[in-house]
Amino acid sequence: MKILLIHGLSRTSLSLLSLEWYLQQSGWVTEQFSYLAVSETFDCIVERLRVRLQILASQGAYSIVAHSLGGLLTRAALGLSSLEMPRHIVMLGTPNQLPRLALHAWRLAPFRWWTGQCGLNLTNPDFFTSLPNIESP
């Protein structure tokens, strides 16, 4: 079974390398999904993730480990179509409700520039209620 690792906002795949190494040493097959919020919209990232999940699902059982925004991307992508659900979803620090810190950070121009639509979504309560609930063991 493959495990897809998805990093958080303003991070890269490097942030999950030690976890990936540990999982591989434990016998798991891993892949990473990467994105850059400064150059992609949330919707574009979600669509790329949806395609990646379709490919993974076509290869057999899979699981997801997602950090922070990666968990929100996962919820959005899995809700787009009738994908085969992962066996397990582990969300590490995913803000499944509006994080107060995002409201303060959004006032700062560098944060707005660096996080784009992804950062803006974190300041909008309607964004969180619009995300589909997902059920996975």
Residues of each region from the PLM?
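Serine-dependent carboxylesterase/thioesterase catalytic core
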Residues: 2-9, 14, 22-36, 40-133
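A conserved mid-domain beta-alpha-beta active-site/ligand-binding segment of alpha/beta enzyme cores
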Residues: 135-137
